[in-house]
From Swiss-Prot:
GO terms for molecular function: dGTPase activity. It comes from Ralstonia nicotianae (strain ATCC BAA-1114 / GMI1000) (Ralstonia solanacearum). The keyword tRNA processing does not apply. Gene3D superfamilies: Hypothetical protein af1432. GO terms for biological process: dGTP catabolic process. Residues 78-209 form the HD domain. SUPFAM superfamilies: HD-domain/PDEase-like. The keyword Hydrolase applies. Keywords: Hydrolase. This is Deoxyguanosinetriphosphate triphosphohydrolase-like protein. Belongs to the dGTPase family. Type 2 subfamily. Transmembrane segments: none annotated.
Length: 387
């Protein structure tokens, strides 16, 4: 059945401006399940639209980056983070004549498989799953779009294009890669993904480093005085003060962060252009055979590394964040253990027919939870007063 958008007039050429080494939707390696083409959207635009409308994408609104979801209304969630990544990635893709629609689809989908409670939840679930093959959130994101979403009558998942699925799978162990056919081959043969996938990866880094500064300052867990020891911050804070003397407080913080993001974007564009000029790829196949081409300059990489170390030492390892992480780990471990001991406590759709598959279905259930759902589920099972 054609979707309603196919009733619109055929679009003009949406990809004629792209570089020859960009990913072109008309040359996509296709979908697992063949579908008739749209007359109004490219294949990558269809991917993006499917991602936005899926259940897992809506759940990102209530999954955390650093702070547990109910800790404050202004802190980032996985949803706001994904939107920021997509905006940054599209801006850079436009400058480099790469495919904006593909890079947006990858950016919006890259965290679909993330657990509740951020990295603390991911680490806890991975520890629980170690005897059963482990848990990788990138692979879980792929499983969400390949199998777990239930939106279409003809197939499981979203049936996304190869290129979007490739970009979602940012990291993968060799053991898991060996089970993924063409999609896992690059991890076994040392090849690179598309430039759009490489770009989404670094746009993710630009976004989370800078919004973690913002959230850390809002929370009071890091201070402006501490940030003065970070060269990337100090330099752009001085520039902001010179441009707007007398302006302080939240406006100065926002202006400084804005300038840092801009500097990272400008540097990434320049570094990538230089790498592309040196490698001279003529097709996406040339990109796959080359070393990584989307890259910061060495000086910017060094400064970004100092910023990441600062955030690790002062924000992610702050005792209050560590307390939240300990609570999160306890919730994940308790839920996994009780469901493994008695799978009848699981919703029917997560009760495996084969007992050997049960741990993986428990992981699917827990990974799909939002922060507040995981807290409520833990309370329903373990809190006596709920009886």
């Amino acid at each position: 059945m054609n979707d309603r958008l196919d009733l619109l007039p055929a679009p003009f050429d949406l990809e004629g401006h792209l570089a020859p080494y960009a990913a072109h939707a008309a040359q996509s390696r296709g979908r697992v399940h063949a579908e008739p083409p749209s007359t109004s959207r490219t294949e990558f635009q269809r991917d993006r639209d499917r991602i936005i409308h899926c259940t897992a994408f809506r759940r990102l609104e209530y999954k955390t980056q650093v702070f547990v979801n109910h800790e404050g209304d202004l802190f980032r969630t996985r949803l706001t983070h994904s939107l920021e990544v997509a905006q940054i990635a599209r801006s850079i893709a436009r400058s480099l004549r790469l495919n904006e629609d593909l890079v947006e689809a990858i950016s919006l989908a890259h965290d679909l498989g993330h657990t509740p409670f951020g990295h603390a939840g991911q680490d806890a679930l991975n520890d629980c799953m170690k005897p059963y093959g482990g848990f990788e959130h990138n692979l879980q994101s792929l499983l969400v779009v390949d199998r777990l979403e239930e939106r279409y009558g003809g197939f499981d998942g979203l049936n996304l294009t190869f290129e979007t699925r490739e970009g979602i799978l940012k990291h993968c162990s060799r053991n898991n890669a060996a089970t993924l056919g063409d999609l896992g081959r690059r991890f076994l043969e040392g090849q690179q993904p598309s430039l759009e996938a490489q770009l989404a990866n670094l746009a993710d880094e630009v976004a989370y480093n800078n919004h973690d500064i913002d959230d850390g300052l809002r929370s009071g867990l890091i201070t402006l005085e501490q940030l003065e020891g970070v060269p990337l911050w100090a330099r752009h804070r001085r520039e902001a003060e010179a441009a707007f003397p007398g302006v302080g407080g939240r406006r100065m913080i926002n202006e400084t962060i804005r300038r840092i993001i801009n500097a990272l974007i400008v540097d990434l564009i320049a570094g990538t252009r230089a790498a592309i000029t040196g490698a001279a790829p003529q097709s996406i196949d040339d990109v796959r055979a080359a070393p990584p081409l989307v890259a910061f300059s060495e000086p910017m990489r060094d400064e970004a590394r100092v910023l990441k170390r600062f955030l690790f030492d002062n924000l992610y390892r702050h005792y209050l964040v560590m307390r939240m992480a300990a609570k999160a780990r306890r919730i994940i471990e308790d839920l996994f253990r009780v469901f493994l001991e008695d799978p009848r406590l699981l919703p029917p759709q997560y009760q495996a027919r084969d007992p050997a598959d049960q741990p993986r279905w428990i992981a699917h259930y827990i990974a799909g939870m939002t922060d507040r759902y995981a807290i409520k589920e833990h309370r329903r099972i373990f809190a006596v007063e709920v009886l």
